[in-house]
């Protein structure tokens, strides 16, 4: 039987329940993280939980856990479910209290839940690339917080699905921000361009890894804003996330990117990413 973690206990998934008054359910008042496991080891887990705790701090939520304690939780979750390759979803809400927009009283504690599932790497997408569709970014102004409020992302992703695209690339006006569930990069003349870290994007963990690889390989990494037109005229385009890794984009809005094939810089980043899986998994 699959086990899930809820507030300090590992229980059968059939016994896992959420209160109808949980603030995550009625307000989306909470945060989450998603962590990848390769061969039974957690990839960049410290970076993920440092971001998790930062997100909690930004919404004035005291988790009551340290990074090390959270790592212990997800390690045990992998163990009890015998998962070697897959992902761990963990979220924290502001707890259970009568519905009121203001914060509950201090005795109300967060509800922390986590589950793990097995899945393989996205080999086909990594090898052949995906199509993407551009869409106006309608999300709130604190996209740096990994909030449970994902309605804007959901609507963007559904727009992409309707156009047979694997990702929605969002833009505010003409400025590209990020994907519905990824960071976005334009590669031009051997340099990588991506939106700077601020409140308009999530500072992705895979984005950090790509930056590390760029430093290792002496690839220019430019954290600058760029337009939809610049993106469509790039030599290569990639999106990155914990689940997507380093995924090439070969078409945007039905238009071919570059020569329509996965480019050399993308392949270089993918090779570097594989090396980091080995060196940063524990």
UniProtKB/Swiss-Prot annotation:
Coiled coil: none
GO biological process annotation, one example: D-amino acid catabolic process
UniProt-annotated binding residues for substrate: 32, 99, 101
Catalytic activity, reaction form: D-alanine + 2-oxoglutarate = D-glutamate + pyruvate
Listed Pfam families: Aminotran_4
Active-site annotation: 146
GO-annotated cellular components: cytosol
Keywords: Aminotransferase, Pyridoxal phosphate, Transferase
Molecular-function annotations in GO: D-alanine-2-oxoglutarate aminotransferase activity; pyridoxal phosphate binding
Modified residues (N6-(pyridoxal phosphate)lysine): 146
Cofactor: pyridoxal 5'-phosphate
Residues where pyridoxal 5'-phosphate binds: 51, 178
This enzyme's EC code(s): 2.6.1.21
SUPFAM superfamilies: D-aminoacid aminotransferase-like PLP-dependent enzymes (SSF56752)
Role summary: Acts on the D-isomers of alanine, leucine, aspartate, glutamate, aminobutyrate, norvaline and asparagine. The enzyme transfers an amino group from a substrate D-amino acid to the pyridoxal phosphate cofactor to form pyridoxamine and an alpha-keto acid in the first half-reaction. The second half-reaction is the reverse of the first, transferring the amino group from the pyridoxamine to a second alpha-keto acid to form the product D-amino acid via a ping-pong mechanism. This is an important process in the formation of D-alanine and D-glutamate, which are essential bacterial cell wall components.
The protein's assembly and partners: Homodimer.
Entry similarity comment: Belongs to the class-IV pyridoxal-phosphate-dependent aminotransferase family.
Record-given protein name: D-alanine aminotransferase
Lineage: Bacteria, Bacillati, Bacillota, Bacilli, Bacillales
Gene name of the record: dat
